[in-house]
Amino acid sequence: MQNKTVFVGISGGVDSAVSALLLKQQYREVIGIFMECWDNTLNNDQLGHRAFNEHKSGCSSKEDFREAQAIAQLLGIKLIKQNLVEPYWKQVFLPTIDAFKNGLTPNPDMLCNRLIKFGLMRDYCKQLDPNSDFATGHYAALSWDNNQPLLAIPKDKHKDQTYFLAHVKPAQLQDVVFPLAHLLKTEVRQIALAHHFSVATKKDSTGICFIGERHFSDFLKNYLPVKPGVIYDWKTQRQLGSHEGVWFYTTGQRSGLNLGGQAARNFVVEKDLKTNTLYVSSDPEDLQRRGITLSHFNWLYQPNPLTQTVLVRIRHAQPLVQGHITVQPNNVVQVQLDQPIDRVTNGQYGVLYTQNGICLGSGIITASQI
């Protein structure tokens, strides 16, 4: 039993509930933190919102808070509700919209973890108790090298969330605890059922960090204008149809193209922001890339000597692919892959790992090579 306080993020889901339960067995005091980061009304979130479209309340954050309160009451712990709607809007959401405007496909979860969860929220907890630890229900693990915490792949490889954590600052991992590091998701649900948690069978949350599931192109229309343009065949340059604006589409996307009558199903292979043009293809090889340029690289771990052979992931849950890196000036890392991967998308993140599952860090994909 650790004679100190641990703050734990409680979202109203099963993972954070079981995390809080496990921490109660390990710490003198456990305090739950519920982060409210999105307001449907203030943020004009109507188009694409499933609850609004189905004539429901649309107040998923209120429902989540009620679940969090029930968990805290069952465990006998204090729960603090922290309103972070404004900083989330300014620091995470507006930069995300700006990236879409620039033709990129950003990942707001990366910014959210760095700036909100492990930024403002962790800092707030440290202000309340400088000696406290900070815990979340992420499926991630920590290893150690000379008192430096290293982000590592957890036991449950299928639920591994280290991809989303790879852009936090190294210092933000100090005094952090991941209670689910050595558990499978099935084991987490079994623990929740055994302790009669109402969220034991609750569906896993998906969608955008703190916003949830949306019909995504419709959701973006709350914040970006419709701007009709032309769709061309990537190889023949033949005009195939029209679209509503390149920022509503991403590399590899098949749905929403409305290209009926084609011999094979097409997908997006290129976006030209200047001319507002989409290029599509039905040949999967047109999506494949062997080289990736990562900019603004955030090093979580730099072993000495730095390994040149790494494992690479360009999206959550994608199988790891081996590659070789060249470190360039200005925090740029060039990756050459041993085998091609598809749907390499500018604006997304490339995350690098050692062969034994330690996360080296992440960078924003700014270019790719055939």
Curated annotation (Swiss-Prot):
Its EC number is 2.8.1.13. The active site is at C112 (nucleophile), C209 (cysteine persulfide intermediate). Disulfide bonds join C112-C209. Keywords: ATP-binding, Cytoplasm, Disulfide bond, Nucleotide-binding, RNA-binding, Transferase, tRNA processing, tRNA-binding. Residues 107-109 are annotated as: Interaction with target base in tRNA. It comes from the Bacteria. GO terms for molecular function: ATP binding; tRNA binding; tRNA-uridine 2-sulfurtransferase activity. The record marks H138, Q348 as: Interaction with tRNA. It catalyses: S-sulfanyl-L-cysteinyl-[protein] + uridine(34) in tRNA + AH2 + ATP = 2-thiouridine(34) in tRNA + L-cysteinyl-[protein] + A + AMP + diphosphate + H(+). One of its GO terms (cellular component) is cytoplasm. ATP binds at G9, I10, S11, G12, G13, V14, D15, S16, M35, G137. Belongs to the MnmA/TRMU family. This is tRNA-specific 2-thiouridylase MnmA. It comes from Mycoplasma pneumoniae (strain ATCC 29342 / M129 / Subtype 1).
